Amino acid sequence: MGKVLDGKTFANLLGQNLKEKVKKLKDEGITPHFCVINIGDDPASKIYVRTKKRRAEKMGIIQDIYQMSADTKQEEAIALIDKLNADPAINGLMVQLPAPKQIDTDALIERIDPNKDADGLTPANIGHLWMDKHFVEPATAEGIIALLKHYEIPLEGKNVVIIGRSNIVGKPLAALMLEQNATVTIAHSRTKNLGEITKKADVLVSATGQAFLVKADMVKDGAVVVDVGMNHVDGKLVGDVDFDNVKEKASYITPVPGGVGPLTVQFLMEAVVKLTRRQNDR
């Protein structure tokens, strides 16, 4: 039976350290200031934004939420980003995804000043990520690497399979896994014989948003299984992995909730503080 990788407890441990860093900044008259732009009425997005705000407050970070209507025009969102980019009091900035169909989210992300890019998703920061010269990284990917290191799970020379090729999780996680000298395979919706590929994984990460996609017969004995999925089934939050059955085969496994999710929020806060320190030559 696999050991559960407790992301929530680890996130709280990191939070204690981050609060101390924020306190030291405040003692010098510097308070990290973070802005989230949320466009539209997506219920899940509103929950995520509130979760970030609660975490920011706990860390001592100021977080402003800019809630824009579902009929917001592209130029209105661009104008807000330009305003926040130009404001020296703002240290970190992100656009909550998804956005309404009329919004070109790639263009919004490209508009963010890379020095204020808390999500690490601007082309400049993604480029630095692939060149191993990164300063901030997409939070979920960074959180996964940190969690595996926390539990002293080796990655060098391991076969890592990532299901999902998003710019937010799959691709940046592949870059960070390569940096750890893992051998990386990315699978996706067009991948054939998925189970044959996943059974070769020493570390299997699923980030698809498909409930119970990963079954026990797709996992080799002793594999490390990381579940990034967040899906609602019958009123319950579940992951991409059939947890109860896969747990019997895995050596380590993350739960949903309480696994990767808390670390995503925590590492977003870590990024805001890193950006704040750099902007103030700390």
Curated annotation (Swiss-Prot):
Pfam families: THF_DHG_CYH, THF_DHG_CYH_C. Catalyzes the oxidation of 5,10-methylenetetrahydrofolate to 5,10-methenyltetrahydrofolate and then the hydrolysis of 5,10-methenyltetrahydrofolate to 10-formyltetrahydrofolate. Pathway: One-carbon metabolism; tetrahydrofolate interconversion. InterPro entries: Aminoacid_DH-like_N_sf, NAD(P)-bd_dom_sf, THF_DH/CycHdrlase, THF_DH/CycHdrlase_cat_dom, THF_DH/CycHdrlase_NAD-bd_dom. It catalyses: (6R)-5,10-methylene-5,6,7,8-tetrahydrofolate + NADP(+) = (6R)-5,10-methenyltetrahydrofolate + NADPH; (6R)-5,10-methenyltetrahydrofolate + H2O = (6R)-10-formyltetrahydrofolate + H(+). GO terms for molecular function: methenyltetrahydrofolate cyclohydrolase activity; methylenetetrahydrofolate dehydrogenase (NADP+) activity. The keyword Amino-acid biosynthesis applies. This is Bifunctional protein FolD. One of its GO terms (biological process) is tetrahydrofolate interconversion. Gene3D superfamilies: Leucine Dehydrogenase, chain A, domain 1, NAD(P)-binding Rossmann-like Domain. The gene is folD1. GO terms for cellular component: cytosol. Its EC number is 1.5.1.5, 3.5.4.9. Homodimer. NADP(+) binds at residues 164-166, 189. HAMAP family: THF_DHG_CYH. Belongs to the tetrahydrofolate dehydrogenase/cyclohydrolase family. Keywords: Amino-acid biosynthesis, Histidine biosynthesis, Hydrolase, Methionine biosynthesis, Multifunctional enzyme, NADP, One-carbon metabolism, Oxidoreductase, Purine biosynthesis. The keyword Hydrolase applies.
